[in-house]
Amino acid sequence: MASLSLKNICKVYPNGFEAVKDFNLEIADQEFIIFVGPSGCGKSTTLRMIAGLEDISSGELKIGDRVVNDVEPKDRDIAMVFQNYALYPHMSVYDNMAFGLKLRKVPKDEIDKMVKEAAKILDLTALLDRKPKALSGGQRQRVAMGRAIVRNPKVFLMDEPLSNLDAKLRVQMRIEIAKLHQRLGTTIIYVTHDQTEAITLGDRIVVMKDGVIQQVDTPQNLYEKPANLFVAGFMGSPQMNFLDAVVEVQGDAASLKVAGKSIPLPPAKAKKVIEGGYDGKTVTFGIRPEDVYDSEMFIETAKCVFESTIKVYELLGAEVYLYFDLAEFPLTARVDSRTTARPGDTVKFAFDVEKIHIFDKETEQVITN
């Protein structure tokens, strides 16, 4: 296994387009790291530079203690799993998994041992004689992972490996990948645009936008303490609600003026906006859907209560999404499925002020979480 070090990594194409800009990251041995972001953010390009499939324009890449900028992909001791399984259709599962080892002229008895061990780990033993066309999508992806496992690489690189699977299979394969990481203790770098995959799988997540790292942190910290407006909106589904608010300061206290009402800020949050000189300024106020309440018990103790008319009601089993407007801003509340609110109803709701996020309107950087 191995650690990785990426220092000031840049990728600039001949036409001048900067796909990755000054990328800096230290990845620990056996860490499961996720690159996440929208299409075109540079996450797959970064993975391909690590693999050696893209040239690095500038910067230094180390795998372990070895600088590998100019090392051929086959000599980097890595294995890749792609979105497309890339299996040989005329070969059995066994031969697909063994193919790379045969090319490296590994002794036949060692190949047999390595393939069967990988098949056991991935629950493929009963399928070793089958051709890819006789397998389900999930089974094919497990074969692709098995082909990577038998190489016993220092680092696994996975580029959106679950994108071609249906929703149920994606959940199953997420669990399989998590188990695989625990069992093998490998370093894994995993690219996805799906923030649910990122949150459930990663030890740490690298959020990217326009080739630039926005934040690197644990899943919980990314969700609870986003560094900026982009991260706050990207991580979480439904996404965080955003409204414009004006800061009002009175002595050591501060509040946010939203839709004609004042929301008092907790002391720690008030201190941050006062020290930042935001009195009288417009800021962006963020609140996650699960921190918007319609329950009478919460509203009775809330310091600021709003009213709005429900536009859309979505039942998702144990919970309901309520969609409504506050002033000109669309909001979503994630509430208990026992709610009596329905479209057309005017309901009272309140925010959990301890969970408020405040962002600078111009820089979009967080002021306080």
Functional labels for PLM-detected ranges:
Residues A51:
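Helix-to-loop junction immediately C-terminal to a conserved catalytic motif
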Residues G16-E18:
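Short coil-to-beta microelement around the adenine-binding A-loop and adjacent beta1/P-loop entry
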